[in-house]
């Protein structure tokens, strides 16, 4: 099985209604979910020298993630206020903290050389690394979330093997966007559709996957777990539809409890 590292965002998700805080963020979540499939991933991110930063590093280590490049910086760890409305998470105030200045060092790049797959997301300030990583032969994946107006759709996709995004539902406008993304150089684009499943375009055909019927407790981490399940499936040699099915199953597991993991 191939090796995987994530780079970029982390945050502590604070649930005032539950009086609890959970470690999270796309790069952190994807790394943790990959451990479900026997992968020991690495993660490059920045945390503050506060209690939340200590918590996040301890949580990652406990879950089996290599935290040697989770760097502690002076300041506060990124934080997101989260409310639950009918078991769906609604994001409130966000404090970016030390992540506002995140950038990879030359030593970080050297450390990434050992990994086959590198993933990041649109919040992680990691997009500048992808041309170099892709040119070095890494399999690259990037999550655009629902930011369809981002200029990165024009500049970043030629350096991506997998472009992930989210949308409410499938329609002709979405399908045309997906075709254009692959035409600009992305290998495959995969869009999660919440309760409507997911759709992928690989340049030859569309692939659709229905969601698994489960009782939803909290949708936090659903998209991140889909990405992790998919990438682990692909790294193990699964076909595209098989990897999508594994991503769907991983997301179904995650949404049945509070917090990302």
UniProtKB/Swiss-Prot annotation:
Catalyzes the ATP-dependent phosphorylation of fructoselysine to fructoselysine 6-phosphate. Functions in a fructoselysine degradation pathway that allows E.coli to grow on fructoselysine or psicoselysine. To a much lesser extenst, is also able to phosphorylate psicoselysine. Belongs to the carbohydrate kinase PfkB family. PROSITE patterns: PFKB_KINASES_1, PFKB_KINASES_2. InterPro entries: Carb_kinase_PfkB-like, Carboh/pur_kinase_PfkB_CS, PfkB_dom, Ribokinase-like. Signal peptide: none annotated. Gene3D superfamilies: 3.40.1190.20. This is Fructoselysine 6-kinase. Monomer. Pathway: Carbohydrate metabolism; fructoselysine degradation; D-glucose 6-phosphate and lysine from fructoselysine: step 1/2. Its EC number is 2.7.1.218. It comes from Escherichia coli (strain K12). Induction: Induced by fructoselysine and psicoselysine. Makes part of the frl operon with FrlA, FrlB, FrlC and FrlR. Keywords: ATP-binding, Kinase, Nucleotide-binding, Transferase. NCBIfam families: PRK09813.1. GO terms for molecular function: ATP binding; carbohydrate kinase activity. It catalyses: N(6)-(D-fructosyl)-L-lysine + ATP = N(6)-(6-phospho-D-fructosyl)-L-lysine + ADP + H(+). It comes from the Bacteria.
